[in-house]
Amino acid sequence: MTALTVRQVRLRYLTLYGLRWLPTGLTIPVMILLMQERGLTLSQIGLVSTAQGLVVLALELPTGGLADALGSRVVLVTAWAVSLLSLGLFAVADSFALFFLVWALQGVYRALDSGPLDSWYVESTLAADRDADYEPGLGFSGTVAGVTIAGGALLSGGLIALGPVGPVSALTVPVLVAAALQAVALVVLLILLVETGPARGAGALRASVVAAPRMVGQAVGLLRRSRVLLALVSVELFWGFGMVTFESLLPVRLADVVGDPERAAALLGPANSAAWLVSAAGAAATPLLL
């Protein structure tokens, strides 16, 4: 196969990056309300959602060397296949245990998906041209993510507004569409992502797993020695708590105000879309302000 140019690598990277976030945009307006529709209480929704965070926390560092050991393509294909399985299960889940499994699978997906696409882009860019500037592509990915999530959320709101499709509830339709788009994204990934070099083998994976506890210890040590780092981590921690609370309670409160969960989800679609478009604009403007 002909070697990719820098421009081709960037185009493929941004295409895959957008496809990675599009299903997320579709599910954002309906996640909480769909679980409520299936019988979960707010406290149960909070508990099942923790599965994702716990799995990511447990796997993030140990799986960090998988891309080096097996190759970015293998890891990303596995991650996106797990995401597809999670979305398919989300569409039919009707119990606490099944929703817990859905979120645990999402945790596996996010742990595996964290990093390989970016590293592939950097390595492929440098393989095409050792002097190429890859930072603009990485920076533009934030804009692409914002735009695709906004598009997915807007599409989700439109699908919900159209109402149920046969026996499928209006809140379930966006999840099914998200699963279909995830399947398309998986096929596109197989076509577009071409490895630039051989995988490093099992030794790289063993080294990553062995180094994980030491890296955690070093990170904790840095936090203890640096008040600036501790403050930054604290900001992220409290911001995360606030966002999770906001994203969990807003749909429920809106459903109470308008008197209909489906109408609330339909309104959340364009509202989320506008928010993510602003995020995309901010990501695009950031390089100009630095």
Question: What kind of feature is each model-predicted range?
Answer:
Residues T2-A58, A91, R227-W276:
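Helix-loop boundary and gating motifs at the non-cytosolic
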Residues G18, S86, F96-D113, L237:
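Hydrophobic core of transmembrane alpha-helices in multi-pass small-molecule transporters
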Residues M1-Q8, L192-S234:
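Juxtamembrane intracellular "pre-TM" segments in multi-pass secondary transporters
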Residues V74-L89, A179:
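Structural signature of the two symmetry-related core transmembrane helices
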Residues V102-G146:
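Cytoplasmic helix-loop-helix junction between adjacent transmembrane helices
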Residues E37, I149-V175, P251-D260, A284-L289:
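Transmembrane alpha-helix termini and helix-breaking/packing motifs in multi-pass membrane transporters
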Residues S169-I191:
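Symmetry-related core transmembrane helices of the 12-TM Major Facilitator Superfamily/SLC fold
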Residues A58-G71, I160, A281-L290:
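Helix-to-loop junctions at the C-terminal end of transmembrane segments
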